[in-house]
Amino acid sequence: GSFMHRKRRMGYDAAETLAHELVHAARTAFPDSVYDEFFPCQIHQAKFRRYAGNIFRKWYLPMMLLGGIAAAPVLAAAGCSFWGVILIAPLIVIAREFQLRQRIRNAADNLRNAGFDPMPVLLRMSDREIFETATLTREQLAAKKASSPRWQQFADCFPIKTEL
């Protein structure tokens, strides 16, 4: 239909939007996740969407972030002495997002060091598994690979590709 024929719709191109939604479809087996928008946003060309997209997984997160940032100078200009307190909400959102990014970065590094291509494996993990993988050593990951059919399948399907 017309969706595919328009180059851009509300700032998004059709191919990017469809790829984004396909990633959501791939993760439907998992319960609500703190990474609901992280994986779909990784396909976007815009760095901002790749980096900040996960903030939009829940409606209240961008409201807390942007609302707090917008309200603070207004309250300061109005002479309210507690204007700085309103910045606590944006700081909490930023700190939580930083923590989530650090966990997924650690999990990706651990998987890469153990010989896995990290993004396809992480896409197929629940939050609990991602958090656990972020804390595992190479030896612990090797033990999982040796004892778990699921991890063996990860190793078979998603090894790090070596250049020839």
Question: What are the language-model segments listed below?
Answer:
Residues G68-V85:
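Juxtamembrane "helix exit" motif at the C-terminal ends of alpha-helical transmembrane segments
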